[in-house]
Amino acid sequence: MKKLFIFCLCLLFFLAACNSSETKEKSSETKSGSSSDTKVFKQDDGEKIKIPKDPKRIVVLHPTYIGALVEFGHKPVGVIDFVKQNKTLSDATKGAKMLGQNNVEDIAKTKPDLIITTKEDKNINKLKKIAPTVQMDAMKSDYKAATKELGEIVNEQDKAKKWIKNWEEKLEKDKKSLGNKVDGKTITVLQSTPKGLTAFGKNYGRGTEIVYGGYGMMQPEKLEKETKNAYMATPSEEELSDYTGDYIILATMGETPQFTQTTNWKNLDAVKNNHVIELDLQQTQYNDPISLEKQREIILKQLKEMK
């Protein structure tokens, strides 16, 4: 009888230990997500992180990474409120919650299962406590690579490849139709900011991806050197002739920049030849699929009308 009692007691301790172990494992799975519900994603910086296999509530904290998700049928539940200043993306994200960059509490209230932001985001540690957070790096990942990555995140790799293929075919067709207007020609993308003039590199929206990567136009030599490892250069008004060539894209918020009234501007070859393409930043600032399609439409039309 005594032996039976001891056996039963040991059995109870064993079962209790097993139950405790199972509870801990389930608790751990609930907190971090079951391994069957997650996948490993490699970020631009090389770090591998776990993200949901099928994210349903995505928050995007930089406008550049919104358009591809919308294009693939995965409209974010929350987006950075900068999109209010951009008609193209604002129209595409109607119904999404507008979020301030530093308003972490509001971001948490959207109950995201995935957050997409940039490597520069200062709130990254706080965001990671809310949901798995992907950091994108525009210096390491151009718009095509970013489109592929976003397709991978939402399991739409085929849609990403198809968009890129169709996009490249459109640009090649444009290039042939434009002929001598773009062959061997130089072009500069300019914007006036409160800090002065900005001339952009080859991967910064505002038509750069189209005229450089798509149409094969070139940067003036000085601009090319200065933007080889940077997003932009900042020439003075007096230096404009060194940074501009056959064509100029002038990106504005609808205003007439003061520098366009100066002699320095009026004496530029592109200006004298009426080779200035005007872009409204409220439609054309970013380099996502939706914004790029809009930019192409505007740039192609203006180039065709030029002599």
List each language-model region with its residue ranges:
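Bacterial Sec-exported substrate-binding components of ABC uptake systems
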Residues: 4-8, 18-61, 159-190, 252-256, ...
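Structured C-terminal subdomain patch of bacterial secreted/periplasmic proteins
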Residues: 243-307
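Alpha-helical, coiled-coil/dimerization segments enriched in small aliphatic residues
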Residues: 83-86, 198-231
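Charged, glycine-enriched surface loops/patches
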Residues: 124-161, 182, 260-279
